[in-house]
Amino acid sequence: MFAKQIDIHWQKMKGIKFLHWLLGTVLLWVSLSTPALAIPALDYNPWEAIQLPTTATILDMSFIDRHHGWLVGVNATLMETRDGGQTWEPRTLVLDHSDYRFNSVSFQGNEGWIVGEPPIMLHTTDGGQSWSQIPLDPKLPGSPRLIKALGNGSAEMITNVGAIYRTKDSGKNWQALVQEAIGVMRNLNRSPSGEYVAVSSRGSFYSTWEPGQTAWEPHNRTTSRRLHNMGFTPDGRLWMIVNGGKIAFSDPDNSENWGELLSPLRRNSVGFLDLAYRTPNEVWLAGGAGALLCSQDGGQTWQQDVDVKKVPSNFYKILFFSPDQGFILGQKGILLRYVTDLTAAPA
C-alpha cells in the first residue's frame, strides 16, 4: 500500500512538471511570435498623396523657385509643375530613343541640367522651355549618376562609379576632380557644401570625398550589417541606414566613430531606404511598404505616420527644398507632397 501511494504521488509530480514545461513552452512561443509593440502614431499627417499621369518610377526633382519645378524618372520621364508640385504636366523631348533613365535633375535659377543612362546630358538656360543635348566622351567612366547646377554655366557631375567632373563653360569642357573611380555605387549623397558619401554596390564599405581632395577616402563599415544608404546631417555629421531596419549617426567630433544602431520601428521586417531633415531637429525616415516615420529630436525617438501606410508604394527618396516644401518619391508615379496647412508640427 505504501509503495502504491508513492507511485501515485510520483505520477502527480511528473504531471505537474509536464504542465510547467508545457506552459513555459507556450509562453516562449507567444513571446517569439508576437511582434514588438508598435511605436507611437504621429498625431498629424502633413503628406498629400499624388498620382502622376504616369506609372514610371520618379528618381529626382528640382525647383527653379517655389512654384516652378521639374521631375525626372525612368523611361525618359520628364514633367513640369508651375503650382508648387500640386499638379505635373508631362514634357516630351526629341531623343534617339525613349529608354533613357533620367537619374538626376538640378536647377540654379533658370539654368538646369539632366543626366542619365545610357550616358546622356541635357542643358537648359531658359527654365526648361528648351533643352540641348551635351555630347559626352565615349570613354567616360560609368554613366552620369548625379548633377549639381552651380550657376553661370558651371555644374558638377558624378558617375555611377565615382568619377567627379566640373564644367565652367556650360558643358563644353570638363575637369576631373578625382584621379580614379571607386567602383559601382549603391547610393550616393551630396552635402550642401559639396562633400560626397557613397555606399559600395555590395554595402560592404563606404567612401567619402571633400572638395580639394584628389581621391576618394574608403571607410570600413562599423557593423556586420550591410550598408544601404548614407547621407549628411545639417550639422555635418553622417547618418547611415543598414539592412534590417536600423540606423546610426556618426559622432559630432569624429566621423569615424558611430553611435549605437537604433531600431526606429522596433522590428526588423521593414527596410528603410532614405532619411532627410526638414529642420535641424525634425527627421523623416522612409522605406518599403508605405513605411514613413518622423523624429522630433534628431533621430533618437520616432513616431509613425500611419495614414500613409495605405498608399500602395515603397518610398525611395525624401527631398526637402525648404522647411515647408518637401516631397517623397515612390513607385509607379506616386508622390507624397508636404502640405503645411495640414501639419501641426513645430517649425
From Swiss-Prot:
GO cellular component: photosystem II; plasma membrane-derived thylakoid lumen
Leader peptide range in chain numbering: 1-38
Motif Arg-rich patch in this chain: 202-226
Keywords, in A-Z order: Photosynthesis, Photosystem II, Signal, Thylakoid
Coiled-coil residue windows: none
Gene3D superfamilies from the UniProt entry: YVTN repeat-like/Quinoprotein amine dehydrogenase (2.130.10.10)
Keyword Thylakoid among record annotations: yes
InterPro entries registered for this protein in UniProt: PSII_CF48-like_dom, WD40/YVTN_repeat-like_dom_sf, Ycf48/Hcf136
Pfam families: PSII_BNR
SUPFAM superfamilies in the record: Oligoxyloglucan reducing end-specific cellobiohydrolase
GO biological process: photosynthesis
Compartments (UniProt record): Cellular thylakoid lumen
Binding partners and assembly: Interacts with the D1 protein (crystallized with PsbA1 or PsbA3), via the latter's C-terminal prepropeptide, may interact with parts of the mature D1 protein as well.
Notes concerning its domains: A 7-bladed beta-propeller torus, about 54 by 46 Angstroms, with a depth of about 25 Angstroms and a central pore.
Function: A factor required for optimal assembly of photosystem II (PSII), acting in the early stages of PSII assembly. Also plays a role in replacement of photodamaged D1 (psbA). Assists YidC in synthesis of chlorophyll-binding proteins.
Family that this chain belongs to: Belongs to the Ycf48 family.
Protein name: Photosystem II assembly protein Ycf48
Species in which this protein is naturally found: Thermosynechococcus vestitus (strain NIES-2133 / IAM M-273 / BP-1)
Gene name per UniProt: ycf48
